[in-house]
């Protein structure tokens, strides 16, 4: 019978039946693959990576807010279908299914792992475990970068983007000084109003100002109001650089996920304009700095010596000369990496600092210890005739503060899942506790998701994992000389010894290049604030509720962020009774 003559109802029913059969056949195929691996597995109707999962997530999340805030996690029937479910689950699912297991649907397989040794192995085999293109393409709104490239392209990018973060480049000194300056501006602003403030807004302002200066050499006053950002538009532009930066960083998620042509047709038109204008500004800056360097290879910005833009262009020119080419990075590649610096240097750092400030407001005992250390470092500087701190002389002195920072990184990692995939059948090694290593073969196209939260909250690697203990980063090594170099071992050295057990900055062959840049900004800003003030909860904030919600809920941004409602206050240390 001619299909075109079938009744509509019969046609729809037949089509639906064929679709279901097609899905069942695919599911049976992938279940067979899962069985062949020898790993435990569970079957779900929809994976978090599928379009339907991404569509359902914003609709379903609000329905379970109360349950999630109590630390109950997701119901079993829905958890693997929710995008970024791992934060709310912590280790719960791995306690049920094991440290390494598969999730199977009709669209494929995902291998989730909370095995630190396996994770370390995966992160070091970067040519076998690749980044899924669909997950990382969104990080290229302006061009390819060191986070999205693979193989030879990655090697090329890292040769140019790594040198700007070395201590000798001046970038870490620059970010230390600018973070301290912006923190002082923050304190002045808070002290003048003498009230509780929107913490997330102020921390975001601070980190935006820091990355604008250290990234592009452009000064942004912390106290600049949003209304003022609209002024001073140069000829040929539709908005000021600062306004474009403000909009792009504020609406980063929309810019990464929504096509520009859709934004232009909706109420998000101004965001689309900011996206385009920021690109225009950055291209102009690239061309100006390139021209300056072509005249003088040792050129440095008079104000922002060591800024990332100039450093990347210089490294690119050096790479080109070494390879006998006219240029190394294209303009798009420079632009792509500048955007990555903006994303990491603004959003990731802002969220990490926000979690730190909230934690100190909740834990005055920790704040006491950090203040004691801050005062001690300032006293040492004064004995040397210095009135201020700097990166070179003082960064490594903040042992307890460093430990606190890393505990915040552990408990509230910016990225909850590190995503990989295998392009061909690949052997993995699983390391069960108290058992011999076991090998399993993952089929081609299987995704491998390193569950950062499940590792960071794993008692096998972190005794009493829910407790924030800065001392765990120090122990006896903080005061023990290194026998080979006679150099004092600092807490930072221990962070390099926990292979695979701390993945805030990823790890292995593709560890974050800017981790020390972030650490410098974090400690500088915190030390500057705590030199004069204490951080306390704002009026009306319930400490128990705040703690419960920062541990179990998130704002749903590009990286992990707390809910926006938390209010804090700065109080002069002399005005706050402790003990």
From Swiss-Prot:
Signals that turn on the gene: Expression and the subsequent production of PR-toxin take place under static culture conditions (oxygen limited), whereas no expression of the PR-toxin genes occurs under the strongly aerated conditions required for optimal penicillin production. There is a negative control of the transcription of the PR-toxin genes by the penicillin biosynthesis gene product(s), or by a regulatory peptide encoded by a small ORF inside the penicillin gene cluster.
GO CC annotation, single: membrane
EC number: 1.-.-.-
Listed GO MF terms: heme binding; iron ion binding; monooxygenase activity; oxidoreductase activity, acting on paired donors, with incorporation or reduction of molecular oxygen
Glycosylation sites: 194, 292, 390
Binding-site list for heme: 512
UniProt topology in membrane: Single-pass membrane protein
Essential cofactor(s): heme
Keywords per UniProt: Glycoprotein, Heme, Iron, Membrane, Metal-binding, Monooxygenase, Oxidoreductase, Transmembrane, Transmembrane helix
Principal location class: membrane
Enzyme type, top EC level: oxidoreductase
Subcellular location: Membrane
Transmembrane segments: 6-25
Plastid listed as a keyword: no
Protein family: Belongs to the cytochrome P450 family.
Task performed by this protein: Cytochrome P450 monooxygenase; part of the gene cluster that mediates the biosynthesis of PR-toxin, a bicyclic sesquiterpene belonging to the eremophilane class and acting as a mycotoxin. The first step of the pathway is catalyzed by the aristolochene synthase which performs the cyclization of trans,trans-farnesyl diphosphate (FPP) to the bicyclic sesquiterpene aristolochene. Following the formation of aristolochene, the non-oxygenated aristolochene is converted to the trioxygenated intermediate eremofortin B, via 7-epi-neopetasone.
Entry protein name: Cytochrome P450 monooxygenase prx9
Organism field: Penicillium rubens (strain ATCC 28089 / DSM 1075 / NRRL 1951 / Wisconsin 54-1255) (Penicillium chrysogenum)
Gene that encodes the chain: prx9
């Amino acid at each position: 019978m001619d299909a075109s003559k079938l009744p509509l109802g019969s046609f729809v029913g037949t089509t639906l039946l064929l679709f279901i059969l097609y899905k069942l056949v695919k599911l049976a195929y992938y279940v067979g693959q899962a069985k062949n691996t020898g790993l435990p597995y569970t079957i779900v109707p929809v994976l978090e990576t599928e379009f339907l999962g991404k569509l359902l997530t914003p609709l379903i999340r609000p329905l379970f807010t109360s349950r999630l805030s109590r630390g109950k996690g997701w119901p079993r029937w829905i958890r693997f279908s929710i995008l970024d479910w791992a934060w709310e689950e912590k280790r719960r699912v791995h306690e049920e299914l094991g440290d390494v297991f598969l999730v199977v649907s009709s669209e494929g397989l995902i291998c989730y792992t909370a095995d630190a040794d396996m994770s370390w192995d995966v992160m070091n085999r970067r040519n076998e475990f690749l980044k899924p293109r669909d997950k990382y393409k969104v990080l290229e709104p302006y061009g390819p970068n060191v986070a999205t490239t693979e193989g030879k392209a990655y090697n090329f990018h890292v040769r140019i983007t790594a040198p700007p973060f070395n201590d000798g480049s001046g970038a870490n000194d620059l970010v230390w000084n600018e973070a301290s300056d912006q923190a002082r501006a923050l304190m002045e602003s808070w002290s003048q109003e003498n009230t509780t403030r929107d913490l997330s807004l102020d921390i975001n302002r601070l980190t935006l100002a820091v990355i604008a200066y250290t990234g592009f050499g452009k000064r942004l006053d912390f106290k600049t109001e949003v209304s003022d950002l609209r002024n001073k538009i140069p000829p040929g532009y539709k908005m000021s650089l600062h306004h474009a930066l403000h909009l792009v960083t504020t609406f980063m998620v929309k810019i990464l996920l929504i096509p520009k042509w859709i934004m232009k047709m909706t109420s998000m038109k101004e965001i689309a304009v900011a996206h385009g204008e920021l690109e225009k500004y950055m291209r102009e800056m690239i061309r100006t700095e390139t021209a300056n360097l072509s005249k003088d290879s040792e050129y440095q910005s008079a104000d922002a010596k060591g800024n990332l833009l100039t450093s990347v262009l210089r490294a690119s020119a050096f790479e080109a000369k070494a390879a006998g080419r006219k240029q190394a990075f294209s303009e798009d590649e420079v632009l792509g990496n500048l955007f990555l610096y903006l994303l990491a240097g603004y959003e990731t750092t802002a969220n990490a600092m926000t979690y730190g400030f909230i934690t100190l407001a909740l834990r005055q005992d920790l704040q006491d210890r950090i203040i004691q250390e801050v005062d001690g470092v300032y006293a040492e500087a004064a004995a040397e005739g210095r009135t201020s701190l700097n990166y070179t002389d003082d960064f490594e002195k903040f042992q307890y503060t460093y430990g606190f920072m890393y505990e915040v990184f552990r408990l509230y990692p910016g990225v909850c899942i590190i995503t990989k995939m295998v392009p061909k059948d690949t052997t993995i090694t699983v390391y069960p506790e108290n058992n011999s290593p076991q090998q399993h073969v993952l089929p081609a196209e299987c995704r491998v998701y390193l569950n950062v939260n499940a590792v960071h909250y794993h008692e096998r690697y972190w005794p009493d994992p829910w407790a924030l203990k800065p001392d765990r980063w120090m122990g006896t090594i903080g005061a023990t000389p290194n026998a080979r170099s006679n150099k004092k071992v600092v807490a930072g050295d221990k962070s390099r010894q926990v292979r695979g057990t701390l993945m805030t900055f990823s790890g292995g062959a593709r560890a974050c290049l800017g981790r020390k840049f972030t650490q410098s900004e974090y400690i500088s800003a915190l030390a500057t604030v705590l030199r004069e003030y204490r951080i306390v909860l704002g009026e009306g904030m319930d400490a128990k509720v705040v703690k419960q919600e920062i541990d179990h809920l998130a704002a749903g941004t590009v990286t992990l962020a707390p809910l926006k409602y938390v209010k804090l206050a700065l109080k002069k240390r002399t005005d706050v009774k402790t003990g």
